[in-house]
Amino acid sequence: MLYYLIDYIERLYHPPGFQVIRFITVRAALASITALGIALGAGRGIIRWLRQQQLGEQVREGEAAGAISHAHKAGTPTMGGIIILLSVGGATLLWGAVANTYVWLSLVAMGGLGVVGFADDYVKTVRKQKDGLNAWYKVAGQVAVGLFVGSVLYFHPDFAAYNTFTFIPFLKDQVLDYDLFRFLELGVDLGWLVYLPVVVFIVTAVSNAVNLTDGLDGLTTGVTAFVSLGLVALVYVSGNAEFATFLNVMHLPGTGELTVFVAAVTAACFGFLWYNGYPATVFMGDTGALALGGAVGSTILMVRKELLLPLLGIVYFAEALSVIVQTSYFKYTRRRTGTGKRVFRMAPLHHHYEARGLHEAKIVTRFWIVTAITVIAALLILRIR
């Protein structure tokens, strides 16, 4: 809200220097500083409160006694995603143009999935049910958020000009149109029949993939910080007419305001990493993982760059794929031979490397490096076409 207040004062009294508040880059920097400050400042108190409430991580017996022992992590405060949500929400509300459709939709997507994650963490930590929220309820919450995001992106007037189009990597002057019914010329708008399921799938898949990645100290936090840095560049370029023309990508008026939101996400991740880095003094839990997945998924959809996701978020993709491959192959071999076999020693992928003897800090660092490289590659694709 400070943005509107300072802008009002500038228009009314014209004090020197106040006009800089209209620059997105300035507000993105201020949002970053604010989010980082909230995460670092409030983090210690929130962690202390979580510990007092005995909202600690529950380690399954198999994890405590198996080849990979996480017994030492039992009791570490979880639900730390509250820190991330407060940091991003506070910074964006202060410095963002919250009336902008892109901004409030991002906040709703992140907050909505954060609520779903909080419910899951609550069942685990307060009710002491290790499996957490019923899987169907969890998926229903993710689908509901996805449907809301998809409906706004398709039916809201601000998106009418390009509601079913998306960027195609490597191909110049080409876009993908999700409206597969357009060529039929029926005179009836049926594009939503394809677009809404696509949005629901992406929001659900990304949030689950981020959640699967959250298994080692600092892994999801660091990976998402790098992914968010890439998104900062994507949203700023998409909202800037000159840069969009130079890079020959779709110019999406208004998306520049998302820079403030994504910058806050990036800074909040770095602030949370202060406490979540190895050895972690707090875990984000599903509260943070699903919220970050909602932020990444909704943002990439809004700037029409979702086809870059497998590269931009390659660690998320690899973690989710490892679980799918492991589960599918185990069921297939058990049905064929009576004995289930595994492709990986453990899944998700980070546990496979743990089982091979790599220290979790080394695994985390290498996954960060891989993410940094693929984020740079994804940004280069904007130019190399």
From Swiss-Prot:
Bilayer-spanning residue ranges: 23-43, 79-99, 103-123, 135-155, 186-206, 218-238, 258-278, 282-302, 307-327, 362-382
Protein's job: Catalyzes the initial step of the lipid cycle reactions in the biosynthesis of the cell wall peptidoglycan: transfers peptidoglycan precursor phospho-MurNAc-pentapeptide from UDP-MurNAc-pentapeptide onto the lipid carrier undecaprenyl phosphate, yielding undecaprenyl-pyrophosphoryl-MurNAc-pentapeptide, known as lipid I.
GO MF annotation terms: metal ion binding; phospho-N-acetylmuramoyl-pentapeptide-transferase activity; UDP-N-acetylmuramoyl-L-alanyl-D-glutamyl-meso-2,6-diaminopimelyl-D-alanyl-D-alanine:undecaprenyl-phosphate transferase activity
Major place of residence: membrane
Cofactor(s) required for function per UniProt: Mg(2+)
UniProt catalytic activity: UDP-N-acetyl-alpha-D-muramoyl-L-alanyl-gamma-D-glutamyl-meso-2,6-diaminopimeloyl-D-alanyl-D-alanine + di-trans,octa-cis-undecaprenyl phosphate = di-trans,octa-cis-undecaprenyl diphospho-N-acetyl-alpha-D-muramoyl-L-alanyl-D-glutamyl-meso-2,6-diaminopimeloyl-D-alanyl-D-alanine + UMP
Family annotation (PROSITE patterns): MRAY_1, MRAY_2
GO cellular component assignments: plasma membrane
Annotated membrane topology: Multi-pass membrane protein
Protein known as: Phospho-N-acetylmuramoyl-pentapeptide-transferase
One matching Pfam family: MraY_sig1
UniProt cross-references to HAMAP family, sorted A to Z: MraY
Listed pathway(s): Cell wall biogenesis; peptidoglycan biosynthesis
BP GO terms, sorted: cell division; cell wall organization; peptidoglycan biosynthetic process; regulation of cell shape
Keywords: Cell cycle, Cell division, Cell inner membrane, Cell membrane, Cell shape, Cell wall biogenesis/degradation, Magnesium, Membrane, Metal-binding, Peptidoglycan synthesis, Transferase, Transmembrane, Transmembrane helix
PANTHER family for the chain: PHOSPHO-N-ACETYLMURAMOYL-PENTAPEPTIDE-TRANSFERASE, PHOSPHO-N-ACETYLMURAMOYL-PENTAPEPTIDE-TRANSFERASE HOMOLOG
Subcellular location: Cell inner membrane
EC number: 2.7.8.13
